[in-house]
Amino acid sequence: MAKLNRSNIGLSLLLSMFLANFITDLEASSHQDLNQPYRTGYHFQPLKNWMNDPNGPMIYKGIYHLFYQYNPYGAVWDVRIVWGHSTSVDLVNWISQPPAFNPSQPSDINGCWSGSVTILPNGKPVILYTGIDQNKGQVQNVAVPVNISDPYLREWSKPPQNPLMTTNAVNGINPDRFRDPTTAWLGRDGEWRVIVGSSTDDRRGLAILYKSRDFFNWTQSMKPLHYEDLTGMWECPDFFPVSITGSDGVETSSVGENGIKHVLKVSLIETLHDYYTIGSYDREKDVYVPDLGFVQNESAPRLDYGKYYASKTFYDDVKKRRILWGWVNESSPAKDDIEKGWSGLQSFPRKIWLDESGKELLQWPIEEIETLRGQQVNWQKKVLKAGSTLQVHGVTAAQADVEVSFKVKELEKADVIEPSWTDPQKICSQGDLSVMSGLGPFGLMVLASNDMEEYTSVYFRIFKSNDDTNKKTKYVVLMCSDQSRSSLNDENDKSTFGAFVAIDPSHQTISLRTLIDHSIVESYGGGGRTCITSRVYPKLAIGENANLFVFNKGTQSVDILTLSAWSLKSAQINGDLMSPFIEREESRSPNHQF
């Protein structure tokens, strides 16, 4: 069979997606028949079994790739984890591929754990990943594609040089705490750099730095890229540059140039949250220094203040943007996951960039979500009176995209925030919708049942504090995602999440965007300054029985400047149909030369 050119590939892929959409519709009906109300319509998930960390997202020859930690044996985590693999042309519709690789050699025989993809200067993708070796220690391995002409990269090979990075008595690295290599970056000296997460016995978190000229032979640097005491294990580190102007992304090897800051993200195993700092990378000393006010610990800002972990970014060189993925775990007991046959989602992919202040990252659903939009409802200039609730009719409330902008006029009516109120999640947990204040709670009720016995509320409260130095009133915006009434099933984790939003309501409107998808609610406050993701499992507010409301339970009225809500169509997510066959190169022997 002749190799397909780019146009033939595109035609074959369109045909495959058409057929796969038909298959997916049948599968969706089957899921409903099998009582699967919590499977999502447009969030990434395998057809079955367990999924956790996103691994090695990239774009290659016009095809987006997502690898992920996958247990092919069941709906709970298993040490024999493999690299699942799916591909897409738009980051919305996905085709399942065979696993990229499985435990198969001494350096990964007990599991192929998380890692990243690096695109070499010649365009060849290379995977660095953590393997659990025959001694159950953590080591770093490499995998390369068998056929670089295949845009779907369906076959990968493990060179005999594995493992490339190990622990020993000399380097003193704990073999149980040495994992998750990042995307590598190329220095001006021609050497590659990569960091691996670790920690010491006294809970110092580390980003261990390695260097290589050929991507095979790696040498540990004398000093880590960065460390912080009393933080515990740093999982899934991510280190990438961001532009100080505009929202365009920056290629990972763009280091030390004018107009660039760096972000170091770590996933702290002790809290199961993702924290980031913004700072400077000294390319001569190979150290990262957070900006003043940032510390790489629990005081750092989080990418998401809800159910969100092990995130990973990649640079999309086609659309000049950096895209963020994150694992969204279940909030249901394991027995429920086993019964339904699957566990774990990925957040909808987000564009991520540096705010113009240089002090925080902004996140927003990628623009491709708009291709799923259907029926639309628009409101303009409505008043939400104190204690009022308005229903939003005309959209599929269980699968929707909602944007609303609020304006508060009488800010002086805000309650005073106490100096001891420093924990936003605690404030949200103690002050549910029944606790009225001057300004708030106001926001959205999503996945609400007809009798309001079930609902998930995403809302704001505004407080004021007096600045004794300048004798000026400051306002504090609190964003909450309250799952306490989300389900009649009390076996679920129905924690309430909360965070402060860095906006000034005296000069700015208060905006909220919420993506609703059956069992996941992703919310973006203040234009993406604060993100909160939750998992919910209603018993009543399912499918057509789900409702959407806007509410104001405060004592003062709030203006809705605009509200736009869209029904979202289902995407094709990992149907059984594979990508079109492409004839392999004459030699099937992998080329291990970089």
UniProtKB/Swiss-Prot annotation:
Going by the entry's taxonomy, the superkingdom of the source organism is recorded as Eukaryota
Annotated glycan sites: 147, 217, 297, 329
Instruction: Describe, from its UniProt entry, the tissues in which this protein is expressed.
Output: Expressed in seedlings, leaves, flowers, and seeds.
The answer to whether the entry has keyword Signal is yes
Q: Which reaction does it catalyse?
A: Hydrolysis of terminal, non-reducing (2->1)- and (2->6)-linked beta-D-fructofuranose residues in fructans
Signal sequence segment? 1-28
Name its cellular compartments: Secreted, Extracellular space, Apoplast; Secreted, Cell wall
Q: Which PANTHER family match?
A: BETA-FRUCTOFURANOSIDASE, INSOLUBLE ISOENZYME CWINV1-RELATED (PTHR31953)
| Family, per entry | Belongs to the glycosyl hydrolase 32 family.
* Entry protein name: Beta-fructofuranosidase, insoluble isoenzyme CWINV3
Which source organism does the UniProt entry give?
A: Arabidopsis thaliana
